[in-house]
Amino acid sequence: MNSHNNFAPPEGEGNIYEYRYYRLAVGSAGAWIGHFKDALPHREKYSKLVGLWHTEAGQPNEVSHLWAYPDLNARADARAGASQDDAWRAFLKKGGPMLREMNSVLLQPTNYSPLQ
C-alpha cells in the first residue's frame, strides 16, 4: 500500500476507528484520491483522518482510509455533519460514480495497542 498522507494517530486515548476500503473503477484510483484530497479539509471539520492509502499490488484499484472517533456517537455526528457539507457533497458527486464496492469496519484497539 502506498500512503497519501502522513500517518497521524489521534491525541489521547479511548478512540475507536473506522477502516473504510473501496474498490474503484479500473484506472480511476488516482482521480478519486485527487478529488478526496481536495475535499479532505472540509471532511476533517467533522473527524480526523488517520491514514489514506492505495494498493500497488493485488487489487490495484483499491483505496483505504482510517478515521478516528472518540466513540460511536461522535462517528454518527461526524457522518451526519459531513453529509450536510456542500464541499463534501460535491466530492461525493465526483467520487461516488467511481466506486464499485465499499466496505467499512469498526475497530476497537486492544489494551496494548499504541492507537488507543
Where are these regions (language model features)?
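Short S/T/G/P-rich N-terminal loop/turn motif that feeds into the first structured element of a domain
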Residues: 1-116
